[in-house]
Curated annotation (Swiss-Prot):
Mg(2+) 1 binds at D566, D570. Its main location: cytoplasm. This is Alpha-bisabolene synthase. Converts farnesyl diphosphate to alpha-bisabolene. Involved in defensive oleoresin formation in conifers in response to insect attack or other injury. Involved in sesquiterpene (C15) olefins biosynthesis. Binds 3 divalent metal cations per subunit. Can use either Mg(2+) or Mn(2+). One of its GO terms (cellular component) is cytoplasm. It is found in: Cytoplasm. Induction: By wounding. The conserved 25-Arg-Arg-26 motif may play a role in the isomerization step of the terpenoid cyclization reaction sequence. Pathway: Terpene metabolism; oleoresin biosynthesis. The gene is ag1.
Length: 817
């Protein structure tokens, strides 16, 4: 169906674009293309080799096998040992009354797992408060069972040598959870056994004072009324607990807030059968040690999904993601969720992460859930006493708030609160401990505050996360612990490899794009901007999957054509010429081009060929006639251009409503998006489904994309356009409607239109319907990248701006393996 090649007609259509009848014509191309043909064709990625794809396939299979036990059914969590909790379980005496431990294997584990420096803990991560708590706990249990004299001696020496140094972690908010509650209690026990430790250090007295202050604020009755975070550390407040009453807040699984240490302590005071049942179940699961939390099935699943999504490898694990999120959703409730399905206390980090991931995957979740995390004055609560945990909670709340739909005011409140908190936390983290630096805490906060989710580049996001993702990442509770299913070398290797493989595919496509562009005839229009790579980036940064190569290619062709038409209507063509060209488009008749000037004849031929090609490919993919659909779309689009040309010629500034109504069409986003989405391999869009994302005049995805693109463009280009004599922009139109307002006030008004439009776009994208999600995603991701392009300036007009760096990151520079 495609027409005669435009290039074959170049010789017969003699186009002298530098001079036409003595007219003085303007150009829209003050900034040349920075991505030359030779540069693009010099790119040679080794990752195009099949051996890398084969390795990626092996990794995908290995990860699927690894994740299967974690997400199937109730799952089998993998979590590192807690020497501290294991020591508490090792304290439990045999229930048959014999003078031996009920769980002797835990004592053996402690004897065999002391580190070379005399401490206990995770060897790969040193946090002194963690080591001190675990080491003193292990020393005390070995003394109880009168074993391990050498280990006891080495443990005491470690504590004596390091006890004073823990003050540094206190100053920097890097202590393990409830350290000031538990450690003084253990020290009192050690002192009663006459262990030779420096009990009179000023820091120890300070710690004891902090413990007393915290307990003084505690309502003793509330401990027994509703589950509270202190249930996690009951072993640290044995002196005040009424053991019979504490059973009223026991968890369904027999534990106290999923803590083996706390549960073991309660069992030793009460002999409760459910406590023992919980301890037995944990020992059966882990063998000869216990973790600091169990189960962590909800948090673990969410973190697995989050890492897979953020590393950009989610297309390989759609089944696993669905299973994990279905499981979380089954346990979702209006009060929020904890780290485990049986945890009676909602956790802000887990709830916010769950909300974001469930909403992103189109589950029905309400933001009203965050009301549970406000105090009596309506302010958000975030104070667990553990800095890293609080920051993780706020980061997740901040990210969740960016998925707001219209009218969800609580998410606006959450965003405001989290932003303020994170800015303050950033100052603190930059001067805090090496632990926070090792965990990339400052980087995470900075990036979150700098980069809005709606104005971010999906492939750059994946690359950045590969650069900060830590396979050995450790979390902090009462001890330092790791979740190997969540952070591991396989995820990182696949993330990097997959990024580079995709990039190598894109580089081959870029060569095809630049070759086509060079031969298309479009470079002959020297008045127009040449941005083939920027337009390829616009689609490839979001719709990057290999199977959508044709979608990317035709999208880029259309965008390149649109740029010539845009610059022709805006700057180069006379009003009489533009009227003829618009009529030629309306007639869809090549013979009518005889009335056009030579440069427009060539332009019309290229236009005719590209529209035919796109319509033909769309018809093949969708199985129905679409030429008339595309013809009407292009006609509307160019009529919008022509109306703006008339405004310019008449020096007319329309009302803002007039401007926006026309601008939604003349921005050209609708026809551009349709030229991609209808050609996505394997994605059938019935007419009914298509109308749910594309219906002129209705606020659906293409309409909202067009509105956002038009206004985002205006906020960064209106000054340059005004200098060229183009008077109509949303800012100028608003100032005409409101002569009393300043330019800054006009800009603020435009942003006040943009913000709710972005929320509407998010809702349209994420609401469940029968539209193929890949199609909605393509439309949505293109909007995100467009907002990036106009974030700091006119990224299309001046291709040397930040967009250049994004293109390099996304399409040029691979990740080192």
């Amino acid at each position: 169906m495609a027409g005669v090649s435009a290039v074959s007609k170049v010789s017969s259509l003699v186009c002298d674009l530098s001079s036409t009848s003595g007219l003085i014509r303007r150009t829209a191309n003050p900034h040349p293309n920075v991505w030359g043909y030779d540069l693009v064709h010099s790119l040679k990625s080794p990752y195009i080799d099949s051996s890398y794809r084969e390795r990626a396939e092996v990794l995908v299979s290995e990860i699927k096998a690894m994740l299967n036990p974690a997400i199937t059914g109730d799952g089998e969590s993998m979590i590192t040992p807690s020497a501290y909790d294991t020591a508490w379980v090792a304290r439990v005496p045999a229930i048959d009354g014999s003078a031996r431990p009920q769980f002797p294997q835990t004592v053996d584990w402690i004897l065999k797992n002391q580190l070379k420096d005399g401490s206990w803990g995770i060897q790969s991560h040193f946090l002194l408060s963690d080591r001190l708590l675990a080491t003193l706990s292990c020393v005390l249990v070995l003394l109880k069972w009168n074993v391990g004299d050498l280990q006891v001696e080495q443990g005491i020496e470690f504590i004596k040598s390091n006890l004073e140094l823990v003050k540094d972690e206190t100053d920097q908010d890097s202590l393990v959870t409830d350290f000031e509650i538990i450690f003084p209690s253990l020290l009192r026990e050690a002192q009663s056994l006459r262990l030779g430790l420096p009990y009179d250090l000023p820091y120890i007295h300070l710690l004891q004072t902090k413990r007393q202050e915290r307990l003084a604020k505690l309502s003793r009755e509330e401990i027994y009324a509703v589950p509270s975070p202190l249930l996690y550390s009951l072993e640290g407040i044995q002196d005040i607990v009424e053991w019979e009453r504490i059973m009223e807040v026991q968890s369904q699984d027999g534990s106290f807030l999923s803590s083996p240490a706390s549960t073991a302590c309660v069992f030793m005071h009460t002999g409760d059968a459910k406590c023992l049942e919980f301890l037995n179940s944990v020992m059966i699961k882990f063998g000869n040690f216990v973790p600091c939390l169990y189960p962590v099935d909800l948090l673990e699943r969410l973190l697995i999904v989050d890492n897979i999504v953020r590393l950009g490898i989610y297309r390989h694990f759609e089944k696993e993601i669905k299973e994990a999120l279905d499981y979380v959703y089954r346990h979702w409730n209006e009060r929020g969720i904890g780290w485990g399905r049986l945890n009676p206390i909602a956790d802000l980090e887990t709830t916010a992460l769950g909300f974001r991931l469930l909403r992103l995957h189109r589950y029905n979740v309400s933001p009203a859930i965050f009301d549970n995390f406000k105090d009596a004055n309506g302010k958000f609560i975030c104070s667990t006493g553990q800095f890293n945990k609080d920051v993780a909670s706020m980061l997740n709340l901040y990210r969740a708030s960016q998925l707001a739909f219209p009218g969800e005011n609580i998410l606006d409140e959450a965003k405001s609160f989290a932003t303020k908190y994170l800015r303050e936390a950033l100052e603190k983290s930059e001067t805090s401990s090496a632990w926070n630096n090792k965990q990339n805490l400052s980087q995470e906060i900075k990036y979150a505050l700098k980069t809005s989710w709606h104005a971010s580049v999906p492939r750059v996001e994946a690359k950045r996360y590969c650069q900060v993702y830590r396979p050995d990442y450790a979390r902090i509770a009462k001890c330092v612990y790791k979740l190997p299913y969540v952070n591991n070398e396989k995820f990182l290797e696949l993330g990097k490899l997959d990024f580079n493989i995709i990039q190598s595919i894109h580089q081959e496509e870029m060569k095809n794009v630049t070759s086509w562009f060079r031969d298309s005839g479009l470079p002959l229009f020297t008045f127009a901007r040449e941005r083939p790579l920027e337009f390829y980036f616009l689609v490839a940064a979001g719709t990057y999957e290999p199977q959508y190569a044709k979608c990317r290619f035709l999208f880029t062709k259309v965008a390149c054509l649109q740029t010539v038409l845009d610059d022709m209507y805006d700057t180069y063509g006379t009003l009489d010429e533009l009227k003829l060209f618009t009529e030629a488009v309306r007639r869809w008749d090549l013979s009518f081009t005889e009335n056009l000037p030579d440069y427009m004849k060539l332009c019309y031929q290229i236009y005719y060929d590209i529209v035919h090609e796109v319509a033909w490919e769309a018809e093949k993919e969708q199985g129905r006639e679409l030429v008339s659909f595309f013809r009407k779309g292009w006609e509307d689009y160019l009529l919008g251009y022509y109306e703006e040309a008339e405004w310019l010629a008449a020096e007319y500034v329309p009302t803002l409503d007039e401007y926006i109504k026309n601008g939604i069409t003349s921005i050209g986003q609708r026809i551009l998006l349709l030229s991609g989405v209808l050609i996505m391999d394997g994605q059938l869009l019935s007419q009914e489904a298509l109308e749910k994302v594309d219906y002129p005049g209705r606020r659906v995805l293409t309409e909202l994309n067009s509105l956002i693109s038009r206004l985002a463009d205006d906020t960064k280009t209106y000054k340059a356009e005004k200098a060229r004599g183009e008077l109509a922009s949303s800012i100028e139109c608003y100032m005409k409607d409101h002569p009393e307002c300043t330019e800054e006030e006009a800009l603020d008004h435009i942003y006040s239109i943009l913000e709710p439009a972005v929320k509407e776009l998010t809702r349209e994208f994420l609401k469940p319907d029968d539209v193929p999600f890949a199609c909605k995603k393509m439309l949505f991701e293109e909007t995100r990248v467009t907002m990036v392009i106009f974030k700091d300036g006119d990224g299309f007009g001046v291709s040397k701006l930040e967009v250049k760096d994004h293109i390099k990151e996304c399409l040029i520079e691979p990740l080192p393996l």
